[in-house]
Regions:
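Terminal targeting signals and extreme-terminal segments of soluble enzymes
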Residues: 1-148
């Protein structure tokens, strides 16, 4: 049984990245199955740190972008939205080029929080980073009367 409340539409997910950090870094949603969502980004000058390796912060942006979208696809968006509460990452090895691919899998899908395990790897399939993302599931009604 699928965990998705909305069936992922990869074209629509990619279009949603326009004019965001995901667009700037070249993040692309690539695949999904009943239990996971996959995205990738290039390892290039946009995502390098000064020594030519993938910047750890760029890995975290990929992880949080992927996990946030996964949470969004698991809720009734007419009643709820999702925001990040906490993200942590263990950087396992450096990448210099190619693409880094991330796969998000749910650890916990509760009424008010979601927790995601996000595994990043290089083109060779070897792990480069393991991230955990906690998302808050917030009622849209809670937005009424709030100023931006």
């Amino acid at each position: 049984m699928s965990l998705w409340r909305q069936t992922p539409d990869l074209e629509q997910l990619n279009a949603s990245q326009k004019n965001s950090i995901g667009d700037l870094l070249g993040i692309r949603f690539e695949a999904f199955d009943d239990e996971s969502l996959t995205a990738s980004m290039p390892v290039d000058s946009r995502t390098h740190q000064p020594f030519g390796l993938l910047h750890g912060g760029a890995s975290v942006v990929l992880a949080e972008s992927l996990g946030s979208m996964a949470s969004y696809l698991c809720v009734d968006t007419s009643q709820y939205y999702c925001v990040g509460l906490e993200v942590n990452a263990n950087h396992l090895r450096g990448l210099r080029s190619g693409r880094v691919t991330a796969v998000a899998r749910a650890i916990h899908l509760g009424r008010t929080t979601h927790v995601w395990d996000i595994r990043l790897s290089g083109d060779d399939g070897k792990p480069s980073c393991i991230a955990r993302l906690t998302m808050a599931v917030v009622p849209l009604a809670g937005m009424a009367g709030r100023a931006g």
